[in-house]
């Protein structure tokens, strides 16, 4: 665990007792802070009590005694309206920060008192609308394969303050959501990666401009940044950073870049002063199929170069990466039919990589629709043999599809798996693909995308070969 001494001897309020909140409370207490924790969910409060974390309903506390509110990233800060605990903190005029800010302050304290430099204990921060988790996991995997001391956490699922304490040459690879960045005013990573920016989480940020601004802070604060320039918003941001004098590199999965990193199909290149150097070829790496994974791999290789890390076996290490659960995860091959779990695709843009990668698709789609639905995926409609519509979005998506291709109102995931399997097995394609890429949130029928993905895997594994 990383101990946080920034509030030593002071009283802090903490709201949100999931994994990251519980870890933050323990880290603060070990650093000498007086913590009062609470959550709207009674189970979180119960867990905190079991871990000897002081709990009291913050609605009835004297907020003039607190110096800060430590807030879980899932709690609304501004939109659609501030949570009551945020209003309390603002009325008391105290700072509101999250667990990544506590990590940043603890690291800064360590660097100041140890005499080490930023690059002696590298902090890699990764953000973007889609691809964050894969890039985070792939970078950590390669560093581990090369023998480095690596700690991976943040939005990928491991609470950042549960990671091992700071020591020289330990590398921290951290996935950051826009919500976490909002709560991290001191964010200054050694290297910051921005993968892409498309409309998402507008319900929490109020506007796309506010969402972009949150993501921008990660790269503007970085000692060195890499930005994908395949998107107009990111290209403009890259140019802004260059004009402002930031150390920033360009990455493209679509076209040549003058100084930076780019992909030509499966081949990955770096370009420096007009000289092109091939870094790796992703051909036949099933866990890194698709142009989106070429971008993820480019970001990882760019980071390694910035860290001055090289290894002659880099392709072997890339090939050994197994991929993440729920992200274009190959579940099973049954005869000529391939089953793919892409449950982490919670919006249209996140479904695009899978739809672009495969052909002869039997698409299971639906759930709780995001703004824009599946309109952005029309360019892939020619690849779809049939769709199986589930959840709240079924009727809406049926209207969008119209007569573009056949569809079934399956409504439930179990029905969809069985219907899609029957149709795919009868298909004469060399390899038919039953693709579960819902392009929607899961909350209408499942607790989260992980539970939804596990349900899909379970239904697929129960299928009997005929």
From Swiss-Prot:
Task: Give the UniProt entry's GO cellular component terms.
Answer: cytoplasm
Q: Where in the cell is it found?
A: Cytoplasm
Provide a Gene Ontology MF annotation, just one.
UDP-N-acetylmuramoylalanine-D-glutamate ligase activity
Name a biological process GO annotation: cell wall organization
Residues binding ATP are 128-134
At the top of the EC hierarchy, this enzyme's class is ligase
Tell me the function of this protein.
Answer: Cell wall formation. Catalyzes the addition of glutamate to the nucleotide precursor UDP-N-acetylmuramoyl-L-alanine (UMA).
Tell me the HAMAP family matching this sequence: MurD
Q: Which NCBIfam families match?
A: murD (TIGR01087)
Q: What name is this protein filed under?
A: UDP-N-acetylmuramoylalanine--D-glutamate ligase
Organism field: Bartonella quintana (strain Toulouse) (Rochalimaea quintana)
